[in-house]
Amino acid sequence: MSKTFIMIKPDGVKNKHVGNILARIEKEGFKILGLKYLKLSLEDAKQFYKVHSARPFYSDLCNYMSSGPIVAAALERDNAVLHWREVIGATDPKEAAAGTIRALYAESKEANAVHGSDSDENAALEVSFFFKGNELF
């Protein structure tokens, strides 16, 4: 079993897709280890996305991710990172396969409903950013 980190972004929350996305998580066989509903401060968004700090979209990304509430979750299942990436689809919803979360719920490349860790190493870092050990079950 492995872990991944997922986030329902501000557009996914605003457009009332949280229930459908959480249901999909369970349907796909993930165990929810931890779940939080919160609003990132701009500083927290900058810290979380610091890996992208040299990229031209960094400022817009941080402003967007701190613009409204999000849902953060730590999940577990076999091949968790890879499976979640398959479930959510391509970053650009125009390129996302039919039936993926982004094909169903994303508005744009930035407002694409969900985030998912891209490696086991990043999953561990991202889970620890949002959850203390006693907050995971």
UniProtKB/Swiss-Prot annotation:
Keyword Kinase on entry: yes
A Pfam family annotated for this UniProt entry: NDK
Keywords, alphabetical: ATP-binding, Cytoplasm, Kinase, Magnesium, Metal-binding, Nucleotide metabolism, Nucleotide-binding, Phosphoprotein, Transferase
Xref: SMART domains: NDK (SM00562)
Domain of life the protein comes from: Bacteria
PROSITE patterns cross-referenced by the UniProt entry: NDPK_LIKE (PS51374)
Cysteines engaged in disulfide bonds, as pairs: none
GO molecular function, one term: ATP binding
CDD domains: NDPk_I (cd04413)
Reaction catalyzed: a 2'-deoxyribonucleoside 5'-diphosphate + ATP = a 2'-deoxyribonucleoside 5'-triphosphate + ADP; a ribonucleoside 5'-diphosphate + ATP = a ribonucleoside 5'-triphosphate + ADP
Main localization category: cytoplasm
Keyword Metal-binding set for record: yes
GO annotations of cellular component type: cytoplasm
Residue sites binding ATP per the record: K9, F57, R85, T91, R102, N112
Protein location: Cytoplasm
This enzyme's EC code(s): 2.7.4.6
Family the UniProt entry places it in: Belongs to the NDK family.
Subunit record text: Homotetramer.
Reported function: Major role in the synthesis of nucleoside triphosphates other than ATP. The ATP gamma phosphate is transferred to the NDP beta phosphate via a ping-pong mechanism, using a phosphorylated active-site intermediate.
Stated name of the protein: Nucleoside diphosphate kinase
Organism: Leptospira borgpetersenii serovar Hardjo-bovis (strain JB197)
